[in-house]
Amino acid sequence: CKDFIIDEVQIHAARYFGADAILLMLSVLSDEEYAALAAVAEGYGLDILTEVIDEEETERALRLGAKIIGVNHRNLHDLSIDLDRSARLAALVPDDAVVVSESGIRDAATVRRLGGHSNGFLVGSQLTSQPDIDRAARELVYGPNKVCGLGSANAAQAAAAAGAVYGGLIFEEASPRNVSRETAAEIIAAEPGLQYVAVSRRTSGFRELLVDDLAAVQIHAPYQGSVEAERALIAAARAELPDTVEVWRAVSMTGLQDGGELATDLLEDVDKLVLDAGDGGTGTSFDWSGIPDVVKQKSLLAGGLNPANIADALAVDCLGLDLNSGVEYPGQPGRKDSGALRRAFATIRTYHHQDRS
């Protein structure tokens, strides 16, 4: 029960309505009031999240025997957010206590930033304001990652269950992962929890790629020879597609052109970039050190990603990852290995930028 609890009747009501835990804020309670309310909660077997906002309150919480410390990043006077507060106050907390970061938890990058010193996160409107809370939770915890080359409803369901947000449907007859429009419709109907991306090497007729509930079209055509021609291709796709469908551009980072330079040039023309090795789907990676910093937060990193190198890929700090052949059964293009998916996303979930100290 997350409320400004100041009276024990609120705890009785919380338990009556099925609460497992309550929030006690030291900013509004004296030590005596906290102890009395904590005793009532403990009598019901409720966990207590003790909220603190500074060093003094953290010391009070420990003195009062709090085991779950909630660090509120929000200044309750001016509502500003200080995300560094968790790191400062977690350093005062013993290792056997649980630290929960509160307020300002808006994306996976924030979760990874705070994960080195926080054991959990308290998130409210960032999730409840979304039309699909399950998908929003996946994006918050794992990031906007994509599993491409889905060939069946089972593969899509495994991708969503593992933590993916996007599912890639390849509409390209030359690809071993090509799907028909009928198969695509079956996949989308069976797993509506993914946002689907149509992937194609075509340079015209983008409207033909439209299927129900499509989130984006990923242009995987070869390099068009110049930045101007690339922009014309992207503009042509936008002209054919509804405003609700994003336009992504795959950029080969190992081609004849400078992939990093091209990605930078196209940054403002696309909704997202996909940085890949060659034509994609080859199971090979490229030199990630050549990715310009300026494009990373609008790019999905692709090319040879698998459970063994996911942590290294996350360290590149792109917006998200694009997995394909590295989470398939060997020699079976399009048949996703649910075990490999789970291992990859387990690494994504637990990845953070620093150890708690």
Describe the predicted segments one by one.
Residues 11-32, 70-80, 117-137, 164-177, ...:
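Glycine-rich phosphate-binding active-site loops on the catalytic face of alpha/beta enzymes
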Residues 6-17, 54-64, 104-123, 151-162, ...:
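Catalytic cores of alpha/beta
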Residues 83-93, 115, 127-146, 181-191, ...:
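C-terminal helical cap(s) of enzyme catalytic domains, especially alpha/beta-barrels
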Residues 63-144, 272-275, 279, 283-301, ...:
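Active-site/ligand-binding-proximal alpha/beta "capping" segment
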Residues 4-5, 27, 53-55, 74-76, ...:
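Active-site beta-loop-alpha junctions enriched in small/polar residues
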